[in-house]
């Protein structure tokens, strides 16, 4: 992980309860976050009563996971990276509107392009291929045709999300150590 040069690491594996990261020393990394506290921060940091930890969303980060929760973390990091670049340039900046429209469409209405912002972006690292990402369920008794349809649906779901939030995916990749 250190040799890959990432600025921040998010572990998104277990939507309801964070699972422990398989490399014990990871918590010594300065910018390591589990998904649930990170998502909680994003949903509440704008509230005047929020008194939890602050998160410094950094560019060129990885999200390690592969399900819907990891996609949410990628989406959040991308929204925050764009917010950091454009909030002062857009009167009444609205991150919720950007989430609903998607980054390209939101920026387009202000004659801006993501490519011009100088953002490296977030990369989702998934240990298997996209067709095995648990974005839709495949019943155990599914016919081969149904299995194939669900796998195509998984790729379509991911591609739609990539188009909307502009993060990257490294499939069949898994960190195995810190150095």
Predicted regions and their residues:
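A Rossmann-like FAD-binding core segment of flavoenzymes
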Residues: 9, 83-179
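Short beta-strand/turn micro-motifs composed of small residues
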Residues: 13, 65, 126
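Glycine-rich dinucleotide-binding loop and its adjacent helix/turn
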Residues: 18-111
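Short, surface-exposed amphipathic charged segments that create phosphate/polyanion-binding patches used
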Residues: 2, 47-50, 137-140
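Feature captures the FAD/FMN-dependent oxidoreductase FAD-binding
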Residues: 1-23, 176-179
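Short, structured coil segments at secondary-structure junctions
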Residues: 5, 27-28, 165
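Solvent-exposed alpha-helices and their adjacent loops that cap or buttress functional pockets
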Residues: 3, 52-56, 114-118
């Amino acid at each position: 992980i250190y040799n890959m040069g990432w600025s921040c690491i998010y572990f998104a594996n277990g939507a309801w309860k964070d699972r422990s990261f398989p490399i014990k020393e990871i918590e010594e990394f300065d910018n390591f976050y589990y998904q649930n506290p990170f998502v909680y921060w994003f949903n509440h940091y704008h509230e005047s009563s929020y008194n939890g930890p602050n998160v410094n969303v950094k560019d060129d980060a990885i999200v390690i996971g592969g399900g819907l929760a990891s996609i949410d973390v990628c989406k959040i990091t991308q929204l925050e990276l764009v917010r950091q670049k454009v909030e002062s340039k857009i009167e009444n900046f609205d991150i919720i509107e950007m989430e609903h429209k998607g980054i390209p469409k939101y920026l387009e209405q202000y004659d801006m392009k993501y490519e011009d912002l100088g953002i490296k972006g977030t990369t989702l690292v998934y240990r298997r291929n996209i067709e095995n990402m648990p974005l839709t369920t495949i019943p155990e008794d599914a016919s081969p045709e149904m299995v194939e349809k669900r796998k195509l649906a998984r790729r379509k779901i991911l591609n739609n999300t990539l188009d909307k939030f502009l993060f990257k995916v490294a499939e069949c990749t898994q960190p195995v150590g810190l150095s």
